[in-house]
Amino acid sequence: MATGRSTSTESSEKTCQQRDPLPEYRALCGTDGDAAEILTDVLTNTDSDGVVFCLAHNCYSYNIGGGEALLTLCLPAKRPWGAEKCLPVIQFRCDASRAQEFLFQGRPIPVRYIQTNLNHRAVKKFFKPILSVLTCSDKKGGGGEGAHADLKSTIFWFRAKFVAAVRKTFKITASPFWMISTFGCTEAQFVLVSSCYFFERHECTIDTLSHLSRLFDGSRGRQLTTVNTFSDLAGMFGTSAWLGRVPEFSAYVGKKLARDDLESAAVDEAVNAFRGQLMLSNADLIHYIYLSFFQCLNKEKFLEYSLRTNPHNIDGVPPEEPIITGFIDEGFKSKMATYYTKSSYLKNHVRVGSLYLDGVEGYSPEAIEAGPPAAAGGGGGADRYWAGQSRDVQGLLSDILADHPASRLSPDLHGLLDLAALGDSSGVAGGVKDSLFPEPLRCPVYRCQYLNKTFFAVVTRDNLARAWERAVQLPTQVTGWEGMEDARLTACVHYAELAFSLGHLREQLSVSRHEYFNPRLPVFNLVLDFDLPLKKPGLSLERVYSICRSVRSDVLSVLGVLGEVDEAAHPVYFFKSACPRPEWDEPYAGRPFCTCDAKLGLRIITPLPRGVAIVGGAPLVALAKILNRMIKMNREDLLEICPGLPDADGPLDTGIYHRGRCVRLPHTYKVNEACGLERLLRLFVCHPGSPDKAAYIRDAMTLRNLLHHSKSAYWEGNAREGVSEEAPQKTKVVYSVTDVSENFLVCQTQQQLPRSYERPDSRIETMTGRDLVTWVTEVAWPKVFHNIKAYIPDDKTTQFHFVKFIHTSHNIIQVKPQRGNNFVCISSNHRNKTQSVRIFIVLYTNKKDEVTITLMSQCFAHKCNSNKPRAHFSIPLQLRGRDF
């Protein structure tokens, strides 16, 4: 309707100018009565004593001249969207002197005068869209008095509907308060904003025009608090000194909006430069966008940009050179470019702490080597070992501790690991280990699942490699099999798989074995547990091989930070978890290589660079995190099969490098509850740099190459190159690996947040003169309890009637019931309604006299994110005044 009316208005004005080229001015009108009724009275020529005021107009020269003028009265459109902001409703001829008084002196024009000089043809075109809807007709009427009679009679018969339509189409008010509150309460802002908004071409909101008016002219003029009537508003507008500057302001608005569009496009381009190219998680992406826009548009930079684009300086700004993007810190851009790019990440953001030491030893070679075939009895598994359950471990270590109190071994798994790490016969180790083995060897500790029980085994002589040689069937009958391609060779390697547990613990150790990580011993082989969630099952052999090659490249790149790496010769062993066994009636033809439906599981093992060892679990955790970041950058390989990878921590498990954690050995099985064997870790050949794969496969079935704390043949061979017996080479011991820029987006985001006082408890006690628990009891808890009653179900509110408070840290107060330890979950209804939920209050202060208290809970249920803290509500409290 607005578009049709606007077109009619333009044609009407052209017709009037052809007939009588009078100067025409548009004015926003208002009446002290009901504008819709008065407008209807004008159109129906009904007697009325009403008058019309000019609230704003587009005559900026303060001079109309002699003769007559054509005045077009307008009303604000209720929903203009992108169309005209005010629409014409009346057009009439007016004496120049009366028009001068109407526009510039605030004198109203009587309705009778308007009726006498009304332009009937123009008015009919103004309201043709509304009348065609009311009469359900689109007939073209004639002009002149006949047309006016037709218009008059139509509106007369449909007066009620016409008045309602006018009220829906136009913003009609009976006082100037809407105008003042919308366009500004000072003279300068009101005149500039209202004139530009209603009568000039622009594409912006009133808020934008208000901001630009303050940039255009800092002086405000008089306050409009005394303007109470349309007469006052009309007088103020017509006599304002800023009316003549509206064209200048309109030109500035055009320049400023064009500059803002240029700057906005430049900022978006700068942000999207990294946004679309880097593998960012959703959290990192949010932080990155926040930081980018904050650097461009923070208060200080925005004020600087506003100063450089004010009316005095905007013409001097280079037209095609953005200003705001220059505010982005070059260091921030450089860090983004290098941190999320594989080629520069390791070089610029990873730091390694190391020193050179003599006598760095892991497992004793005798403990992981096979005994004589006769001693082994031709079988597999452990040849010399001690095994027992938890109670046996406790009894053994208790006896040793009674005989050797200086050993200070704890009677649990940790003590067993400490005992296994002892190997110096000249010290206390010999005497401590006498009850186990004749030689005090540094030996591994394994976990074995047997008869639905967990056994811990300390092994000092092992025949596991012989068992693997019998279980793994190589394509030796094929001539030249050593030179096959990796993928083809993988398909030709078969296993004599077992289905059930074996009859003796010694034999079971050959099919079910997990190595415990021992922080008392240095690490020589990097063992990685790789689990990649899959979008859907069905991976081809070539796809899995491509993933392995990509991961191999990342592993070798990370190892290159620790020492020299020959990428062609350095072995990286891959062992893929066997797919679920097919159903008996499932056809084999067309079956993909990998049918794993939940995840792709790999065990990845590689020796550290020559002469390098790692002590402690922290560097290994850091390496796994770094590798996770590297792997997540492989957009082309992994994103299609695992769309959620950017938001995950990564496919590598970082929790296997702590005391008491173990990882399953290659070529072994998982044992299910029915004592069945499943998920065999099968060899997956991936050694593209070598034409001879026989040595690679042989080493992949050698125990010393697959354990955390044993020196592999490759490591020892490289470490001894060029070293004389008189001057043995020292070992480079890595004690720390640090990603110096880890979480730098989060850290920089936190730096931009309001500063919090470091010790909320001290501030509260200092300002209130009470200890923290007393203040919480008397001041904070009543308000917290009020919110609990308001927002938490009644059946869970009663448990908070009698509580006590425990001061646990500088900003945490734990809430406990008077009876019992904890509460029932207040977030969800669990079937097991146990009182295991912790409730606590967190204190936060970033203002001198105010503290924010947040009620939080921790529920152990999986439905509540497994003990993840959850905030329920926050309340600000004044430390002085009524809250005190």
UniProtKB/Swiss-Prot annotation:
Keywords: ATP-binding, DNA replication, Helicase, Host nucleus, Hydrolase, Metal-binding, Nucleotide-binding, Transferase, Zinc, Zinc-finger. It is found in: Host nucleus. Pfam families: Herpes_UL52. InterPro entries: HSV_PRIM. GO terms for biological process: bidirectional double-stranded viral DNA replication; DNA replication. GO terms for molecular function: ATP binding; DNA-directed RNA polymerase activity; helicase activity; hydrolase activity; zinc ion binding. Its EC number is 2.7.7.-. GO terms for cellular component: host cell nucleus. A zinc finger (CHC2-type) spans 825-864. The record marks D529, D531 as: Essential for primase activity. Associates with the helicase and the primase-associated factor to form the helicase-primase factor. Essential component of the helicase/primase complex. Unwinds the DNA at the replication forks and generates single-stranded DNA for both leading and lagging strand synthesis. The primase initiates primer synthesis and thereby produces large amount of short RNA primers on the lagging strand that the polymerase elongates using dNTPs. Belongs to the herpesviridae DNA primase family. This is DNA primase. It comes from Equine herpesvirus 2 (strain 86/87). The lineage of its organism: Viruses, Duplodnaviria, Heunggongvirae, Peploviricota, Herviviricetes.
